[in-house]
Regions:
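A beta-strand signature from Gram-negative outer-membrane beta-barrel systems
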Residues: 107-149, 648
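Extracytoplasmic beta-strand/coil segments of soluble accessory domains associated
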Residues: 53-92
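Conserved C-terminal beta-signal and adjacent last beta-strands/turns
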Residues: 10-12, 178, 217-218, 228-230, ...
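Outer-membrane beta-barrel signature, preferentially recognizing the C-terminal barrel domain
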Residues: 256-277, 319-321, 363, 402-407, ...
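Periplasmic-side early beta-strands and strand-to-turn transitions of outer-membrane beta-barrels
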Residues: 136, 144-145, 153, 165-260
Length: 649
C-alpha cells in the first residue's frame, strides 16, 4: 500500500497550499483534494525524453500537440502557448519559433526531472502571465552522499539514448552533473509510413518533400549542472545551468525544419529561514534563459519536379528570444496565518535576426509586479487568498507605425478546502487572471495586431475527493469566462469566449498486488459576441479523453497494461481551418524488474495493436502544408517497442 501512504503525505502538503493542482514527481498518480501528483518522471518515463508525452499520458486534462518525433507541445484544459505558464526550476523559458517548433516543454528532458507540478486555473499569483494554468518543472537536486546512474535506452524507429547522472558532496556543498545524448529516425504510423511516406501519400508538393527520405528525425544533447552551498542550517545558495542542443528536427507537416535549437537556462537562488519575527522564510531568485532557433528548407527537395534542373536556394528564418527575471519573496506567520508578499520583475526580448525584413521586430516585454498570499485554517476549513498587481510595457523597434504598449492588471483568487474527515474533502475556488499579448501577436509581419488588449480569465472550480476503503474518486468542474481572448483568425484579434469542463480521476486497490488508476477529462469551448467567421466552436479544445491503467506489483517487478481512449474530434472551428478527426484507443504494455540492487530493466510496447490515428488538429495559429487548400494531418506513431537498462550506485 505504498501509494496510500504517499496519498496521506500529499494530503498534508495540500492543506498548506490549496491551489496546487497537479504534481508530476515520480509516476504513480496520487491525488488529493485539488492536487494530482505523478511521480518518478526520471525513473518511469523512459520511453523518450519528451516531457509533453509524459504529461499527456498521466494527466487526463493535458493533451499532446504532436508536430514531430520529439519537442512536442501540450494543451491544458483547452489552453496552450502563452495562456499557460511553463517554469523550469522557477525560471521562465520561451520558444523562439513563432510556429511552436520549440515549445517551452522541449527545453528539458524527462531523465533530468524530479517533479512537475501543474496548477490548473487562475490560482497562481507569484508568476507573470498565468492565465489558465502553470506547469512547474523541478529538476533533480544534488545529494550529500555519492549517487549516480547510467541509462542505456533503445527503441523502434532507430531510437537510441544514453544518459548519466552523478551527485555527491559534503554537509556544506553538494554538486550534481547530468548529461544525455539521443537520436531517432522518422517514426512510422500504423500503416507503416514514415514522415517521407506520409508526405507522398498525402500528395505534398514535391518541392516540400524531403530530399533524403531516410533523414534522421532528430538529434539531441543535454547538460544539467546544479550546486548547493549551505551557509548554515537556515541559509543556502543554489545555482544551476541547463543546456539543450538539438539538431535537424524534422517537421513534416510544415514547410521548414529546425536546423538546430540551442537553449541555455541559468538560475541563482538564496533562501534564508527563521530570520526573526518578520521572516519565516526569505527567497531571492534570479534567472536568465535564451533560445536560438534557425529554421530552413535545407532538407527539402527545393525544386518543382524530380527532373527539374533548377534547385531553389534554401529559405532560412532565424529567431532568438531571451528573458531575465528576478523575484524576492518573504513569508511570515501572523495571527495563525501564513502571509507571503513579494516583488517580481522580468524582461523578455523576441526578434527575428539576419534579415532586413524581420517577421518579428526586436521587442521587449517588461513586467513589474507585487503579489501577496494569505493561508489560513478555520477548523476544518483551509483557505488561501492571493492577489497580484502587474504593470507591463511592450517596446518595439518596428520602423513602420511603431506602437509601444502599456498594460495594467489587478488579479485575485480565493481557494478553499473543507475537510469533512480524513476520507472526504470538498474544494472550490474563484479567481481572475490576465496575460498580455506577446510580440508575435502584436507585431508579426502578417498576423500581428498592435491594437490587442490583454486577455482576462474569470474562472470558478469546484470538486470533491472521496476515499471509500481502497477506492478513491476525485471529480472536478470548471467554468472559465474569457474576455478579450487572443485568437488567430488569420490575424490576431480579441474575442469573448468561454471554456467549461469536467475531469474525474482516482484509483482502486483491488488486492495487495493489483491496482487500477483511471482518469477522464472533457471540455468544451464556445465563442461569444462578435468574431470573425461563422463557427462558434473554439479551436484546440480536445475531445473526451480517458486513461485506464491496470497494475500488478511484486517485490522487484511491476506489470502495467494501459488504455488511452479519445473520442472523435467533431466540435471544431472550421473557420480557423480545423477539421474533424476520428476517435481512437491505444493499448500500451510495460514491465519493470529490479534484476539486482544496482541494475534495473524496463521493457515496453506502446500502441500494441499498431493503430493508425491522428491526435492533433490543424488550427491556423500554426503553419501547415496544404493540398487542395486542405491542411494535411500528421499521424501519430504506430507500434513502438523499447528497452531501458539502468545501472545505479
Amino acid at each position: 500500500m505504498k501509494r496510500f501512504i504517499s496519498l496521506s503525505l500529499v494530503t498534508t502538503a495540500v492543506l498548506l497550499n490549496a491551489s496546487e493542482v497537479t504534481s508530476l514527481d515520480t509516476i504513480s498518480v496520487v491525488e488529493t483534494a485539488n492536487s494530482k501528483i505523478v511521480k518518478d518522471v526520471s525513473d518511469e518515463q523512459i520511453k523518450s525524453a519528451d516531457l509533453a508525452e509524459a504529461l499527456s499520458k498521466n494527466v487526463p486534462s493535458i493533451s499532446l500537440v504532436r508536430r514531430s518525433g520529439i519537442a512536442n507541445d501540450i494543451i491544458l484544459r483547452g489552453q496552450k502557448k502563452d495562456n499557460i505558464n511553463i517554469l523550469l526550476d522557477d525560471a521562465k523559458i520561451y520558444g523562439a519559433c513563432p510556429n511552436r517548433m520549440d515549445p517551452s516543454t522541449s527545453h528539458v528532458l524527462t531523465n533530468n526531472i524530479q517533479s512537475v507540478k501543474v496548477i490548473e486555473g487562475p490560482y497562481d499569483v507569484e508568476n507573470f502571465g498565468t492565465l489558465s494554468g502553470v506547469v512547474k518543472v523541478e529538476t533533480k537536486e544534488p545529494t550529500k552522499d555519492v549517487h549516480g546512474e547510467i541509462n542505456l535506452n533503445a527503441g523502434s524507429f532507430g531510437y537510441k539514448k544514453a544518459s548519466a547522472t552523478v551527485s555527491g558532496g559534503t554537509d556544506r556543498f553538494k554538486l550534481l552533473v547530468s548529461t544525455s545524448t539521443e537520436e531517432g529516425d522518422q517514426y512510422k504510423d500504423g500503416n507503416g509510413n514514415d514522415f517521407s511516406e506520409q508526405q507522398i501519400e498525402k500528395n505534398v508538393p514535391y518541392t516540400n518533400q524531403y530530399s533524403n527520405t531516410k533523414q534522421k528525425a532528430f538529434e539531441k544533447k543535454t547538460l544539467l549542472t546544479k550546486g548547493q552551498f549551505n551557509i548554515n542550517d537556515d541559509q543556502e545558495i543554489k545555482l544551476s545551468y541547463t543546456a539543450n542542443r538539438s539538431d535537424n528536427i524534422l517537421y513534416p507537416t510544415g514547410s521548414m525544419d529546425a536546423d538546430y535549437d540551442d537553449s541555455n537556462i541559468y538560475t541563482v537562488g538564496y533562501t534564508a529561514r527563521n530570520l526573526g519575527n518578520f521572516s519565516k522564510e526569505l527567497n531571492l531568485d534570479y534567472y536568465y534563459s535564451d533560445v536560438d532557433h534557425p529554421m530552413s528548407t535545407t532538407l527539402r527537395n527545393r525544386k518543382m519536379t524530380p527532373n527539374s534542373m533548377m534547385t531553389m536556394d534554401p529559405m532560412v528564418s532565424r529567431l532568438k528570444t531571451s528573458i531575465w527575471g528576478s523575484k524576492v519573496k518573504n513569508s511570515v506567520e501572523v495571527a495563525d496565518s501564513l502571509v507571503t508578499v513579494g516583488l517580481d520583475t522580468s524582461v523578455r526580448n523576441w526578434r527575428a535576426v539576419d534579415t532586413a525584413t524581420p517577421s518579428i521586430p526586436s521587442s521587449d516585454t517588461t513586467n513589474k509586479a507585487i503579489f501577496s498570499k494569505i493561508e489560513k485554517s478555520f477548523g476544518k476549513l483551509d483557505l488561501e487568498f492571493g492577489t497580484r498587481y502587474d504593470y507591463t510595457d511592450v517596446d518595439t523597434s518596428k520602423v513602420v507605425n511603431p506602437e509601444d504598449k502599456k498594460y495594467v492588471g489587478l488579479n485575485a483568487n480565493v481557494f478553499g478546502i473543507y475537510n469533512i474527515d480524513e476520507n472526504t474533502k470538498y474544494f472550490a475556488g474563484v479567481g481572475k487572471s490576465s496575460r498580455v499579448p506577446d510580440a508575435r501577436e502584436l507585431y508579426h509581419s502578417t498576423a500581428g495586431n498592435s491594437t490587442l488588449e490583454q486577455t482576462k480569465n474569470y474562472e470558478a472550480d469546484v470538486g470533491f475527493d472521496k476515499t471509500i476503503g481502497t477506492f478513491n474518486i476525485r471529480p472536478k468542474l470548471f467554468y472559465s469566462v474569457l474576455k478579450d481572448y487572443i485568437y488567430n483568425s488569420g490575424t490576431f484579434e480579441n474575442i469573448d469566449a468561454k471554456i467549461y469542463g469536467l475531469d474525474v480521476s482516482g484509483f482502486y486497490f483491488m488486492t495487495e498486488n493489483f491496482s487500477l488508476d483511471y482518469g477522464m477529462a472533457y471540455q468544451r469551448g464556445k465563442k461569444d459576441g462578435e468574431y470573425t467567421g461563422n463557427d462558434k466552436d473554439l479551436a484546440e479544445i480536445p475531445p473526451l479523453k480517458g486513461n485506464l491503467a491496470l497494475n500488478y506489483e511484486m517485490t522487484k517487478s511491476k506489470y502495467t497494461a494501459e488504455v488511452v481512449a479519445v473520442d472523435s474530434w467533431d466540435s471544431y472551428d472550421s473557420s480557423a481551418r480545423e477539421q474533424e478527426l476520428g476517435g481512437y484507443a491505444v493499448f500500451n504494455l510495460k514491465y519493470t524488474n529490479q534484476l539486482h540492487k544496482n541494475i534495473g530493466l524496463t521493457l515496453g510496447v506502446d500502441n500494441v495493436l499498431d493503430k493508425t490515428y491522428a491526435s492533433t488538429n490543424t488550427y491556423q495559429d500554426i503553419t501547415y502544408l496544404t493540398v487542395n487548400n486542405e491542411r494535411i494531418l500528421f499521424n501519430d506513431p504506430g507500434r513502438y517497442g523499447y528497452v531501458n537498462l539502468k545501472y545505479s550506485f
